[in-house]
Structures are given as C-alpha cells and as structure tokens.
Amino acid sequence: MFLAAQTMISPPEAVRKELDSGCAGWQLAPVTPEIAAEIKTRTPGWPPNLLPGDFNGDGQTDVAVLIECRGSAQLVAFLSNGSGFSRQVLEKPQAYDPREFLHLIRKEYEHDAIGVEYEAVGGHAWVFRDGRWQSVVR
C-alpha cells in the first residue's frame, strides 16, 4: 500500500490522487532540520508529516498527512475501507509553520491517534471516537 521511493515512503496512490485533486502541487509540510533529524531516528525511511495508523480500530491502515499547499498547512486524515480511502479534513488551511509535525500516539486512547506537535510548545491529539474525530488537548 505504501510506496518506497529511494528508501523514502510515500502516501498510497489513492491518497496522492485525492490530494492532487484538492491542491495541485501539494507537498508533505517541510519541518525544521532538527525535527527532521529526530523523526529520522524514530522512523527511518518515513518522511515527516506522513503518518500511518489504525485510527478507527477497524484493522485497516489509515493515513494522516500534514500538507503544505500554496503557503498554507492542512491536516487531512484518510480512513481506509479496504479498497479505498475516505478523506476527512481535520484542520482547515492555516499559516504554515515548519515547527509543526505529526507523530503517532499509541496506548493512550482506544485506537491509534494523531499527535500534532509544535516544537518546544506542545500540541494536541486527534482521536477517532464514536464515529467522529475529536481534538484533545495534551
């Protein structure tokens, strides 16, 4: 499902096509060199701001991405149904900040959760509960 490009993982094709249709020229939101180095030690081969997990607990691999498009950042989750993905915008376009990054949260919630962190500031989590996404302050 995930594609390796020169040892770097990229989003599944269906996710890339969906992102292309919403914002031609999008890219995974770049991060500071310090954050990139930290992410590389935790998850070699995975780029910053591409996050796989089972966010709704159905056993399928879902995907969250923090993208940069036309100078704005947007957080989008893609829930897998086994044959495709449903797109859900979690955070509408806002000013892009290279100190913002995603990380996977396990064991704190019923299912995997999306952590949205700001370097040296803190952050929040997006948790899928009762059929909908909820933002939780951490």
What is the meaning of each model-derived region?
Residues 20-41:
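Transition segment at domain starts
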Residues 44-45:
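Extracellular/luminal recognition modules and glycoprotein regions
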Residues 1-25, 86-138:
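Acidic, small-residue rich beta-repeat scaffolds with periodic aromatic anchors
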